[in-house]
Amino acid sequence: KGYALEDYYDTDDSKEFTKRYLECEQDSNLHGIEVPALDMMKKIMRSAVETGTPFIFFRDTVNAANPNKHAGMIYASNLCHEIAQNVGFTNLAEEIINEDGTITTKTNTGDMVTCNLNSISLGRISDEELEENIALQIRMLDNVISINQAPVPESRMTSDKYRAIGLGTSGYHHYLVNHDIQWESDEHIEVADKLFENIAYYSIKASMELAKEKGAYPAF
């Protein structure tokens, strides 16, 4: 029909994917089979129990929350789903045959996702140290982008364009033991909610302060 369904997603304001999906569904020139949603869900659940896969990616939700939707679209993620960035294809723009017989190609560079990650060891840090350490880690991760050696030009350009980083955690069970918190208790749920809200807040705050110092990333 002249378009690919994977290039669209639904939001509260726009149902572009649903609209085009229904168009395809009603097109007699497109052949397919009808699968009950419940049967599909049963297969997914059985596979998840037996193998741990597949990993479910809710593209509508991810793209609706994408802070860089003005610059592209998120098509997929890695298995753990902590990397959610715009993806774009590199296309051939021009091919020049030189007099010496060599060929020069020019391309329009797409977005090639890069992964710059770090973790807080929750079992070895106090709540009072959290904000200071996160600020340091955010700065370190940003510096990694600058000094890292990318294997291909597209990944270098994408790193510089978005300056995307990921700050995660390790030692979560250690943290709970240190604070005498029983697993899946009401206290556990409350503490987890507060802890990770603080981590998110301190991370965004540190990123904001860094932007004041160094400027916003080019695709902002």
Predicted region positions:
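Polar, glycine-rich mid-to-C-terminal structural blocks
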Residues: K1-T51
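Generic alpha-helical structural element
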Residues: E6, N29-I33, K106, S126, ...
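Aromatic side chains
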Residues: Y9, F17, Y21, F55-F58, ...
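Active-site-proximal structural scaffolding
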Residues: I33, A37-M40, V49, G110-C115, ...
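A general alpha-helix detector
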Residues: K43, N116, G171-Y175, V191, ...
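Function-dense linear segments that define catalytic or interfacial modules
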Residues: A48-S159, T169-H179
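Internal maturation/activation junctions in enzymes
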Residues: L136-R156, A164, Q182-F220
